């Protein structure tokens, strides 16, 4: 199904060809309704390129434009913008087509790929904390959108389950472990012994050496140490799964660092044989003499003592994902501090001839209301599970005040959807590379750009259908029963400005979703949903639904139905659930 944007873009392309002009500029949704629904800067771009008057070029292009079946005659504005205003009939027909479409007008992408998305990646023997929230919810949202667009997505949780910290964990397990505490709260006890051992290591050379020996034994396959390591991994995985269950996050693979241990020698041998790496001062190193950015930043892939590092593991990971998982693209949703590391890794992979599209998707930090990195009062990282549970408690208080008559089960279910949705949306509505301030009051507000505001718009539509005593708008997973007034009407009537505006916004969902992957920006979708909710509330105030006469009543019910479906689908792509009541 063509979108308004694609229809106009095709006609613009034809007009440029007829005028003997090359393609240039872009056609975008207008940001101000005074300038129509869509606009293009093509004349300004061409004018600058060709040294011609952009307004005269715009008039020349408009003379070749044939858009009479889609929009009013295009208008030239300002220095040379070309503006398009859609016919009411165009909007009515497109809205009706989308109403009957399972995918809400969103076409699958033509260039389908197999994409491995590496996100989350917590460390074993440590609790997940607030620092993991951005990678986790951002990676999940990108995976949901990519899958909806037709890509084959493999979600990989590359957990940190190997490394020097296990020497300390194993020594602490053997010397400091409280078995009763382990039974009560396994991960908390593992964290305690790790912290205590780490403190001893910093001041006691004997403990430091003992921990090193435990690590050597683990790496050599000592049975006792492997058994302890396995228990630590199992306890940590259980804790991860509890958090992921709360957040509705799932993975297809959990290939941690240890999965690649047997592959690391092969990575080094391969790079040495290819002449990509060389031995330097006892270590195996890759130099980037031909890369100005990396020329003074060599990459060690095997240390002098024969040990491997993160670089070796990440190169083995790329090889596995490309050659065994057959990935066309690998997306790493990892914080900005790892930028240099991934530039080096990707440069080595390109030298090896890997053709997969490798992307490092960076993100900013979560700040407290003091604008510093979010911490507990004692200066520790805020545990993620505690943060999520606290969100649900805050939401529950609001529900108790607003709707005390609900049952306990209803209150708990709604609180979970609102609380977790608020946390996710606060993250995803911010541009990913910027820091954002974590504020309970702001993110749980029923006003402004928040998840509860969007959820409330959906709930309000559900209440309209309950009052109308007709089949309500669809929820994901329900049967495909639509009400007669919602889908079987022969025509929509959108005479009022508010309902016409809402219909235009609904139709633009199909234009917005593919844009999310251009720059990996879920905030584009979040901001669209916020504007859609604004449009619905304006429509709700201006256009009576149940009290209006036919054919407006059926038409407005259908528009409500479609708005609810878009809100629900859009929030689902962000990993956010909608309640039926609030």
Language-model features: where?
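Non-catalytic interaction-recognition regions
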Residues: 1-92, 100, 104-471, 483-582
